[in-house]
């Protein structure tokens, strides 16, 4: 293949000069062949004319200098796919980083692929039970759907995601792919050991491009994970694809965008924000052969949901789980906001009348409580009508019953985790709404699984 020379380096963006008749194509992978940086991969982004191409480095450019040779591989970045990737940690290029020997893959695939066509796509309305009460009730997940976990810093996106992986891996025994995009290395490490301890590691492929990696890695690692998930789907499986965190994918694009010579747009984001997001999200879809159900953590800068990055992500999702700092500060975990979270599945034709009516009833009572809060703060509970007093009392019980102990948080809380079936969830909330538990103290509903546990707890209070 043709060889070129490095002519300019600005951070993670490198310009190379190739012979005029052998200029690499966009997305071709170039490999550095000398200077102690053998194996460094550069991905072509632009052809600037005159034989010069501009590329993003998939690794640190420390020690790279002008005049160093790089050869064109003639293909885009290829990563290992298939069953051999299960239980392994890989980087953006598919190299193992868990010190457990080579992957030994039977097949490699390009990380750049076209999204499935209209004919290939399928849509079913099957629910995916997660065992987390607030999610199953208020914003149920569809099998083969896309879910976003929205939240600011430190409200529990990663813990919620780990609980979902644990529940789905153990209760549904499917394959999962986890892409760690620009998150803390410590969390990636915890995550690996957590999966190992709960014996689900052999069902998960892990792809990491953490915070300390150059922007090229963080920009492409989501595509690496997605390619592995697509392979499982094309084999006819139902696969889960987890991304933590989709915001860092956008951020990596922002970091290289200006260096690639693009003019920044709103809030300094790249002008290609919507297109970059679309390229990733449109590939996460279910076909007639298999399904990809995706759960994506979305960091919300400064808790502002109108920021261009979370706002662009919203458009692609079937269900949104919004985590709220005010709820977390009350000690209610998972800190899901039942009034802000939505799902397309929340439709009586999909989930049935009983589930729908219960979910609507819960939201109605909580909304009423929210409206009355100001009056209570100024005048106290005594000034409310009997009807409103009852509403407030039920709302506070519901609010506490929406909390639940997590399996992955057992080490911190000391309380054993709970998996609650959808049937039990609906029965519990319906009972509270119907007034069956009006005589029980609200503490009895805090951090329990089913309503039966709340009744038991009330006896000991």
From Swiss-Prot:
Membrane topology designation: Peripheral membrane protein
Keyword vocabulary terms for this entry: ATP synthesis, ATP-binding, Cell inner membrane, Cell membrane, CF(1), Hydrogen ion transport, Ion transport, Membrane, Nucleotide-binding, Translocase, Transport
GO cellular component: plasma membrane; proton-transporting ATP synthase complex
UniProt: ATP binding residues: 151-158
Enzyme Commission number(s) of this protein: 7.1.2.2
Transmembrane stretches, start-end: none
Stored InterPro entries: ATP-synt_VA_C (IPR055190), ATP_synth_F1_bsu (IPR005722), ATPase_a/bsu_AS (IPR020003), ATPase_alpha/beta_chains (IPR050053), ATPase_F1/V1/A1_a/bsu_N (IPR004100), ATPase_F1/V1/A1_a/bsu_N_sf (IPR036121), ATPase_F1/V1/A1_a/bsu_nucl-bd (IPR000194), ATPase_F1/V1_b/a_C (IPR024034)
CDD domains linked: ATP-synt_F1_beta_C, ATP-synt_F1_beta_N, F1-ATPase_beta_CD
Entries under Gene3D superfamilies matching the protein: 2.40.10.170, Bovine Mitochondrial F1-atpase, Atp Synthase Beta Chain, Chain D, domain 3 (1.10.1140.10), P-loop containing nucleotide triphosphate hydrolases (3.40.50.300)
Main location: membrane
Enzyme class name: translocase
GO MF terms, alphabetically ordered: ATP binding; proton-transporting ATP synthase activity, rotational mechanism
Subunit comment: F-type ATPases have 2 components, CF(1) - the catalytic core - and CF(0) - the membrane proton channel. CF(1) has five subunits: alpha(3), beta(3), gamma(1), delta(1), epsilon(1). CF(0) has three main subunits: a(1), b(2) and c(9-12). The alpha and beta chains form an alternating ring which encloses part of the gamma chain. CF(1) is attached to CF(0) by a central stalk formed by the gamma and epsilon chains, while a peripheral stalk is formed by the delta and b chains.
Protein name per Swiss-Prot or TrEMBL: ATP synthase subunit beta
Species per Swiss-Prot/TrEMBL record: Idiomarina loihiensis (strain ATCC BAA-735 / DSM 15497 / L2-TR)
Designated gene of the protein: atpD
